[in-house]
Amino acid sequence: MAWGNFCIVPCPWRIWDDTSRKQMLAMLPVLGLLMGALWYGLAELLLWLCIPKMLSAAVLTVYPFFVSGFMHLDGYMDCCDAIFSRAPLEKKKQILKDSRVGAFAVIWVIVLFLMLFASVYSFIEADASYMEF
């Protein structure tokens, strides 16, 4: 159930009942481990295919957002709009419920992607042998 809610990769099990719902929270670390393993596998594949470092960094930057269906990115953008609006509390609550994207959301999502890209690229650039055991 956690896999189906938090990941776009198809899940072969489709059990949606109260028992599964109660266990979903306990399965989130397992889901994170699986998604991280897929991320690592993608990095290994890009390294094995000799994909240029810049392109590899771009793909690895987008992967965690893509595999989660961009769900967390949407929440991040909503929060940035509300927090940086410098509006009263009631107005911030309205901003959180608003489906439109504001300027602060756009600015901070660009900052987020640039920082993540720079981190991934510098990690790859430093030495790609980090993936070897």
Where are these regions (language model features)?
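Hydrophobic alpha-helical transmembrane segments
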Residues: 1-69, 80-93, 98-99, 105-133
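Glycine-rich active-site/cofactor-binding loop and its immediate structural neighborhood
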Residues: 77
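Glycine/small-residue-rich loop that forms an oxyanion/phosphate-binding "nest" at active or ligand-binding sites
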Residues: 74
